[in-house]
Amino acid sequence: MSALKMDDEQSLNVYMQEFRTRFINKSSDEMTSQALKESYKESAATDAWFKKYRDGELMIEKVLEFRNEITLQNKRIEEKQKNILQEAAKQDDHEQLKGELTERIQRLREELNQKREVALANRKANKERIKELQKSATLFKERLGLEIRKLRGDKLQFVFRCINPKDLDQPYSCIISLNAEGDYEVAGCDPPLECIAEFQEKIRETRNFSALLANLRKSFTALGSQVK
C-alpha cells in the first residue's frame, strides 16, 4: 500500500511538473505573441509618425523653396520696376529736352521770319528810294550836269561835271548806297572830301537827298575853285 502511495505521489509530481511546464510555455508563448503584437503596433505607430514627420519636413522644405522663389521673384520684379522707372525718367528728361529744343527752334524760326520780313521790307523800301534817287538824278543831270551810274550791290555813283571852269568835263564823283537798316552811306568820293561824315549823318537825320547832292556839289565846287 505504501508502494501504491509512492507511485501516486510520483505520478502527481510528474503531472504537476508537466502542467507547470505547459503553463510556463503557454504563458511564455502568450507573452511573446503579445509582445510581438505590441512591438508591431509600436513599430507601425513609429513608422506612421516617422512618415508624418518626413512628410512634414518635405512640406517645410517645399514651403521654404516656394518662399525663396517668391523672394527671388519679388527682387526681380523690383529690379524690373526700378529699370522701368529709370527708363521712364530718362524718357521724361528726353521729352522735356525735346520740348525745350522744339520751343527754342520755334522761337528762332519766328525771329528769323521777323528778320526776313524786315529785310524784305527794307529792300523794298530801298528799291523805292533808288527809284526816287534816279528820278532826282535825271533832273539834276539836265540842270546841273549830273550823271548817275548804277553799280553792283544797289549802289549808285553820282558824277558831277561843269564844276572846274577850266575843264567842264572833269568828273567829280561820289558813291551813295543804302545799308541793311535803310540808312544812307556816302563813300568813294573822288577827289576826297573831308566833310563826308558830316553829310552822311545829316542825310540820315533829314532824309533830304536833294540837299545831300547840293552839298556835295558845293563841296566839289569849292574844291575845284582851289585848283589852279
UniProtKB/Swiss-Prot annotation:
Protein name, entry field: Kinetochore protein Spc25
Subunit composition and interactions: Component of the NDC80 complex, which is composed of ndc80, cdca1, spbc24 and spbc25. The NDC80 complex interacts with mis12 and zwint.
Subcellular location: Nucleus; Chromosome, Centromere, Kinetochore
One Pfam short name: Spindle_Spc25
Record's function text: Acts as a component of the essential kinetochore-associated NDC80 complex, which is required for chromosome segregation and spindle checkpoint activity. Required for kinetochore integrity and the organization of stable microtubule binding sites in the outer plate of the kinetochore. The NDC80 complex synergistically enhances the affinity of the SKA1 complex for microtubules and may allow the NDC80 complex to track depolymerizing microtubules.
GO cellular component, one term: kinetochore
Major subcellular location class: nucleus
Family of the protein in this entry: Belongs to the SPC25 family.
Keyword Iron belongs to the record: no
Coiled-coil portions: 61-144
Species: Xenopus laevis (African clawed frog)
A GO BP annotation: chromosome segregation
Keywords annotated in UniProt: Cell cycle, Cell division, Centromere, Chromosome, Coiled coil, Kinetochore, Mitosis, Nucleus
